[in-house]
Amino acid sequence: MLQLEHINLVVRDIPTTLAFYQAAFPHWFVRDEGQGEWYGKSRNWLHFGDEYQYLALSDHGEGENRELSGHQVGLAHFAFVTNNLDAMKARLSQAGYQIAKGGSIDAYRKNVYYLDPAGFEVEFVEYLSDNPKERNLSS
């Protein structure tokens, strides 16, 4: 078995970024937090997730996140699967977050993109089929 354990995001402000992910994942919790040093720079860090996966947030970021419409090397986006995209959108809307980019709706999936407060593009996808071949078809 192989699965993703965590994503480590460097942000400027942990509480602001955490609020977005708390709205998206109300069942997740702060697993641990503390202070440390990252290559000579002090930082606060926090792990937010469940017993199996989490987001690591650190507040020692400098500069701006990658321009998503550009062609720079770096993270374009990451995605989470949900079994109810409409409920996800409603939670984020109620918390004051707007859709950054509408996704596709086809026979086998629907998705949507948000920008978190740190500027990372986050995709949420709901699959409408249990068949992996259908899920992975290109539109």
Q: Where do the protein language model's features map onto the residues?
A:
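Short, charged/polar surface micro-motifs in flexible loops or helix N-caps
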Residues: 50-54, 61-63, 85
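Residues that flank catalytic or metal-binding motifs in active/ligand-binding sites
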Residues: 3, 42, 51-53, 71-76, ...
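Residue-level recognition of conserved beta-strand positions in structured domain cores
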Residues: 57-59, 126
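Vicinal oxygen chelate
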Residues: 31-34, 89-139
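N-terminal beta-strand motif that seeds the catalytic metal site of vicinal oxygen chelate
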Residues: 1-18, 75-80, 130-139
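Core segments of cupin and vicinal oxygen chelate
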Residues: 8-53
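A short, acidic/glycine-rich surface segment
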Residues: 30-32, 40, 62-67, 132-133
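Mid-chain, well-packed structural core segment of small domains
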Residues: 71-74, 78-92
